[in-house]
């Protein structure tokens, strides 16, 4: 027990760092949501990972940036004739978004190098966090890849690329937060016994939450939250009539606004049902209640966002809380792994 406590104290700085990295990712998700809802994401038309750290410093610099923006479809279709002050406002929102992304990278990379060289983290953890670093580099490219889709013909980004951008953020968050939970949750000498299927059940819920977050990105990218602003019915219907008007039929799942919103609603209710069942079956395990509370709050935020036609503050909270819900599920899974025991599951009985 003393050895375990000593290890825990030594790992505390690493745990704090991983927690900070997780919070930074959630902060980025919130800022990204604000940038999108403020329609500021296409105001910076170039990707300069190094030299783009500084904003325009002179009137001439600002004029050059505005001229570049005036060549974009968004300016011509939506913001034609905006003043320099209006342009600066949207430009600075996107600039802060990119600046915080760079800061997040530094918050991760510099301590990662230090802890690795000082051997404060095991080789296994180094490999996992190096994977997170690779995903971070990919995420930076994906962000520009998304923005680029709105600079060509249409004045909005591809909802597929938006979903990719959000999914990569979720993967990075998962790598940081699960490792943080692994440091924080101490193994118990006497472990609580659970059903052999519980961990698999939680894994299924995690996959469904991930799919739900992807469809949330589709809803955002297609502006699907601006239709059927009623709940629980969709303008008086359980199943709206226009779910399958696109051809081929499968395309409706990804590009029909009504279908995408319907799937997003259905997945929310499915996840809620599964979490309630999980809670009932594991009522003696306290972390499951965090998971249940998270899914209830997330659904309430989603319904309010829909009914009030996407108010910015509530919509951002809904996006951010999707990561908190995912994190609470990861926490419960890590808790099960470290503080419970279960019999070996036999899926194919002899």
Curated annotation (Swiss-Prot):
What's a single GO MF annotation on this record? Answer: metal ion binding
Where in or outside the cell? Cell membrane
**In which pathway is this protein known to take part?**
Porphyrin-containing compound metabolism; heme A biosynthesis; heme A from heme O: step 1/1
Q: Give the originating organism.
A: Wolbachia pipientis wMel
The residues that the entry says bind heme are 264, 318
As for family, the record states: Belongs to the COX15/CtaA family. Type 2 subfamily.
Q: Which GO terms describe its cellular component?
A: plasma membrane
Protein name listed in UniProt = Heme A synthase
One GO biological process from the UniProt record?
heme A biosynthetic process
Function, as annotated, reads:
Catalyzes the conversion of heme O to heme A by two successive hydroxylations of the methyl group at C8. The first hydroxylation forms heme I, the second hydroxylation results in an unstable dihydroxymethyl group, which spontaneously dehydrates, resulting in the formyl group of heme A.
The record's catalysed reaction(s) read:
Fe(II)-heme o + 2 A + H2O = Fe(II)-heme a + 2 AH2
Q: Which UniProt keywords apply?
A: Cell membrane, Heme biosynthesis, Iron, Membrane, Metal-binding, Oxidoreductase, Transmembrane, Transmembrane helix
Transmembrane stretches, start-end: 14-34, 95-115, 125-145, 162-182, 202-222, 260-280, 296-316, 317-337
Keyword tRNA processing assigned to the entry: answer is no
In short, the EC number is 1.17.99.9
Which cofactors must be present for this protein to function? heme b
Name the HAMAP family on file.
HemeA_synth_type2 (MF_01665)
Summary of subunit composition and partner proteins: Interacts with CtaB.
What the entry lists under Pfam families is as follows: COX15-CtaA
Please report the record's description of how this protein sits within the membrane.
Answer: Multi-pass membrane protein
């Amino acid at each position: 027990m003393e050895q375990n406590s000593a290890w825990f104290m030594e790992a505390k700085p690493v745990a704090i760092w991983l927690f900070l990295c997780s919070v930074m990712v959630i902060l980025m998700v919130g800022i990204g949501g604000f940038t999108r809802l403020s329609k500021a994401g296409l105001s910076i038309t170039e990707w300069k990972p190094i030299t783009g750290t500084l904003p325009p410093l002179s009137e001439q610099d600002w004029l050059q940036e505005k001229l570049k923006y005036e060549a974009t479809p968004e300016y011509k279709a939506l913001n034609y004739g905006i003043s320099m002050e209006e342009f600066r406002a949207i430009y600075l929102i996107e600039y802060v978004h990119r600046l915080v992304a760079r800061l997040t990278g530094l918050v991760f990379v510099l301590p990662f190098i230090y802890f690795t060289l000082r051997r404060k983290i095991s080789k296994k953890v180094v490999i996992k966090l190096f994977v997170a670093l690779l995903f971070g580099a990919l995420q930076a490219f994906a962000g520009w890849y998304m923005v680029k889709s709105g600079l060509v013909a249409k004045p909005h980004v591809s909802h597929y690329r938006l979903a990719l951008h959000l999914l990569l953020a979720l993967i990075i968050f998962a790598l940081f937060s699960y490792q943080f939970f692994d440091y924080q949750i101490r193994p118990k000498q006497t472990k609580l016994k659970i059903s052999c299927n519980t961990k698999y059940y939680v894994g299924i819920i995690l996959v469904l939450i991930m799919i739900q977050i992807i469809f949330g990105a589709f809803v955002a990218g297609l502006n699907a939250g601006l239709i059927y602003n009623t709940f629980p019915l969709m303008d008086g219907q359980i199943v709206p009539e226009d779910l399958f008007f696109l051809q081929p039929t499968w395309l409706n799942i990804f590009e029909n606004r009504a279908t995408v919103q319907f799937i997003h609603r259905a997945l929310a209710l499915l996840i809620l049902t599964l979490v309630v069942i999980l809670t009932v079956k594991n009522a003696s395990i306290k972390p499951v209640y965090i998971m249940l509370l998270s899914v209830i709050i997330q659904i309430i935020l989603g319904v309010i966002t829909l009914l009030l036609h996407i108010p910015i503050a509530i919509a951002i909270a809904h996006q951010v809380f999707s990561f908190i819900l995912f994190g609470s599920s990861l926490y419960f899974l890590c808790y099960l792994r470290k503080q419970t025991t279960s019999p070996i599951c036999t899926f194919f009985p002899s």
